[in-house]
Amino acid sequence: IGGAKTSFSGTGRIPSQEDPGSATGANLLRVYHDGRVQPDARTAARLDSTGNPIIDPQSNTPAFDPIAPDGRTNSWNYTSLDQLSLPGFVRFNSYSAEVIDTTVRDRKPAASGGLDMAVSRDMGKLLGSRVAWQLTAGMSLNDLSSTRSDPVRARLTTVSDFYSLFGRTPPDGPYSSPSTATENVVDAVGNAVLGADGVAQTISVDTSVLLGNEPAGRVTTSATDDSSVSNRWKLKGAYYTFRAGPTLQLSLTNRFKATLGIGAAVVYSGSSYTVTQTLTPPAGVEITDTSSSEAYKLLPGYFADASLQFDLTERTGFYAGAVFQSAGSYTQAVDTDNAHYATKIDLANMSGFRAGLSYRF
């Protein structure tokens, strides 16, 4: 039978997945979509009054203390070279979006297969011996399936914090600090120092680039476009049709029969509706928000069918024909903090083809 007609509409929002916190305050953890800035992790050896390292009695290793705050941190990372667009600073961003697209999008799925069973009781003859009438009751099961993906109009908000590099230039992103590099040990004239095995000796050197430990400034911008955000609407479920009514059967030959039936129907529908909103920011991975709901509806309706039947024996045969049914429509909503969407499922004026095996008791 033909698939249910559906339409999708609504608005929503995609919140930022990170919290950069306040624009002021030193040595705080701030997380962004394209990096993070953490409290300074630099330490210095604890010395006694004579300048010698103090040994921790529990670990039997030199004791270290955090250095005195100097407005910088060695613990941070960034993702893309684009974040260095302002000379002398690193820009960190967090993104959010508000979907403001009010377009109603229609979807007419293709026909889907299903299962149908019916029983009939002979009630007698009409117009002589060629026309008989029966009472028929049946049940069918069909899928509900509709999916659509589209870019939507949205208002994109970007919160950007700028951190000073103090005249340094970091390696190309992605880069994470603290960082180290391995260098050869050299003597006073620049020659490599070799070990007893003849292998050049190496040493680990701190190459960390220090960054300001709080933003030098914060800028919030908004822009509206039709390409940064896309929505995917998905409806999945099934519906049962219970029907009953009279059927007329005309004997064309000893083996061929034509039937025509009409009557009342009741449709029980169950569906799951999911909306996935996806924001593609200028840098970093996509940000998604998914919301869903379930609905169950009972709808009154009616049906009509016509078919041809060929009897193989007195008890068995094959039939094929057309079916029409109509049971109205219902609306299913997804209503959460971030999504306010609705879909209309229209089960009216549906037609299709039916074929199968008949058996006479």
Q: For the regions a protein language model found, what residue spans apply to each?
A:
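Short glycine/proline- and aromatic-enriched beta-strand/turn motifs that initiate or cap beta-hairpins
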Residues: 1-121, 350, 358-360
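Short loop/turn motifs that connect adjacent beta-strands in outer-membrane beta-barrel proteins
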Residues: 109, 120-135, 146-148, 251-258, ...
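Transmembrane beta-strands of outer-membrane beta-barrel pores
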Residues: 3-5, 139-145, 264-272, 324-328, ...
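Transmembrane beta-barrel architecture of outer-membrane proteins
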Residues: 110-116, 132, 237-243, 257-259, ...
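Substrate-binding/catalytic groove segments of enzymes
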Residues: 310-319, 328-332
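Alpha-helical scaffolds that organize eukaryotic protein assemblies
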Residues: 233, 238-265, 269-270, 304-305, ...
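Residues on the lipid-exposed face of transmembrane beta-strands in outer-membrane beta-barrel proteins
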Residues: 115-121, 137-139, 242-250, 262-266, ...
